Amino acid sequence: MKKNQINEDEVFLINPDYFVKVETFGSNNDKVVVVDDFYAYPDKVRQLALDIPASKNQRIRGGNPAWRVNAFYVLDGMAWIFDQLCNQYFPEIMAQWPAGAMEDSFKRATFMVNVMQSENLPAVKPHMDNPSGLHFASTIYLNNENESNGGTSFYEYVGTNVNEPVSSYITESTNDWTMTGMVPMKFNRMVLYLQNVWHTAYVKPGMFTNDVYRLNQQFFI
C-alpha cells in the first residue's frame, strides 16, 4: 500500500525571490497587489489541487457558483508574507488590526481552490466578499502557461439598484458596471486586494473547456 502524505512547510513554501507590483484601478484608486513567482514549488501546490476531488457541496462552495476544493492543512507558515505585504501596501487598514490577527487567520485557513469551466456560465455580476473594508482576499493562479486565460477583473458600480438581477455572466463594462482593470492569469501569480472591491473571475466562453479547468487558490483574510 502507498499512502500519500504532505509536508506543508515544503509544499506551501514562499519563494524568497518573488516579484511585487501594485496596480490602482478606478476613481477610488482601488489598490491591487500582484506578486509573481509566489510559491517556491508551485507545481506541488497545483498537483495537490488536482489530486483532491472538487465538490459542489454547498457547505464547501458557499455562494461560489463553481466547484471547490476545501481541505485542512497547516498553513500557518504562509502568514508572514501576507502580514508583510498588507502592512507595506495597506498600512491604514493593518493599523486597525489587533496584534497577531494575521497569524490567527492563517491558523484557521484552509486549502481552498475554486474549479470552474467556461461553458454554461451562470448569470453572475461582480461581487464584494465583505463590505467592511477591513478584510483582504487573495487569489493564486494554478493554471500552467498553456492553460492560462482571463484573470481577475475589477469594477465600479454606476447603476441605481445593485441588487437587480442580471441575465448573463458580467465581464465587460455595461450600463451598470464599469470594468476598471484586470489582472491577467499567470501561473504562480498571487493577487491581493480588499474584500470590499467589486470583482469577478474574468471568464468567457471557450477559455476553459474539455479537460481544462480554471484553478485558483483562494484566501479570505
Region locations from a protein language model:
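Fe(II)/2-oxoglutarate oxygenase catalytic core
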Residues: 1-192, 196-221
